[in-house]
From Swiss-Prot:
The keyword Transferase does not apply. The gene is msrB. Its cofactor is Zn(2+). It catalyses: L-methionyl-[protein] + [thioredoxin]-disulfide + H2O = L-methionyl-(R)-S-oxide-[protein] + [thioredoxin]-dithiol. Keywords: Metal-binding, Oxidoreductase, Zinc. The keyword Zinc applies. Disulfide bonds: none annotated. Gene3D superfamilies: Peptide methionine sulfoxide reductase (2.170.150.20). Belongs to the MsrB Met sulfoxide reductase family. It comes from Burkholderia mallei (strain ATCC 23344). This is Peptide methionine sulfoxide reductase MsrB. GO terms for molecular function: peptide-methionine (R)-S-oxide reductase activity; zinc ion binding. GO terms for cellular component: cytoplasm. The lineage of its organism: Bacteria, Pseudomonadati, Pseudomonadota, Betaproteobacteria, Burkholderiales. PROSITE patterns: MSRB (PS51790). InterPro entries: Met_Sox_Rdtase_MsrB, Met_Sox_Rdtase_MsrB_dom, Mss4-like_sf.
Length: 143
C-alpha cells in the first residue's frame, strides 16, 4: 500500500516521517502496509461504549458504535460505515484469497476488509476493521 501514498484519489497529504513519529509501529504497519493485527488483541474489539470511530491517520469519522456488533472474528465489526463517502473499497488478491479491502477515503489508510456475512437484518455486511487503524471518541455522557 505504501505505493498509494501519493495517489490523487486521497486528498489528505501523508508524510512518512511524520506518520512514523505519530503512530505506533502496529498502527503504521496496518494503515500503511496493509498488515493485520492479531485477532482478539485490538483495543476496540470488545468496546461497547457509545461514540464514533475515526481514522487514526487523518481523523475522518468512519463508524458509529450503533453499527458495531460482535461477530466473533477477533476484530471490531460494523454492518455499515458512518456514510458511503468515507470508505474506499478495492479488490484484494493477496494471501491466496479474493477479498474486498477497505480504506479511508480521505487518506488511503488500510482499515481492514468487508465481507458478506454480516447481520442479515441490517446490511448483510461485516466490515472487519483493525483496531490499530482507529481512534475512538466516546459520546459525552448526559447529566
Amino acid at each position: 500500500m505504501s505505493g498509494d501514498r501519493d495517489d490523487p484519489r486521497y486528498p489528505y497529504p501523508k508524510d512518512d516521517a511524520e506518520l512514523r513519529r505519530r503512530l505506533t509501529p502496529m498502527q503504521y504497519e496496518v494503515t500503511q502496509h496493509a498488515a493485520t493485527e492479531p485477532p482478539f488483541t485490538g483495543e476496540y474489539t470488545d468496546t461497547e461504549d457509545a461514540g464514533i470511530y475515526h481514522c487514526v491517520v487523518c481523523g475522518t469519522a468512519l463508524f458509529e458504535s450503533g453499527a458495531k456488533f460482535h461477530s466473533g472474528c477477533g476484530w471490531p465489526s460494523y454492518f455499515k460505515p458512518i456514510d458511503g463517502e468515507v470508505i474506499d473499497e478495492k479488490m484484494d488478491y493477496t494471501h491466496g484469497m479474493t477479498r474486498v479491502e477497505v480504506r479511508c477515503n480521505q487518506c488511503g489508510a488500510h482499515l481492514g476488509h468487508v465481507f458478506e456475512d454480516g447481520p442479515r437484518d441490517k446490511t448483510g455486511l461485516r466490515y472487519c476493521i483493525n483496531s490499530a487503524a482507529l481512534n475512538f471518541e466516546a459520546k459525552p455522557e448526559r447529566k
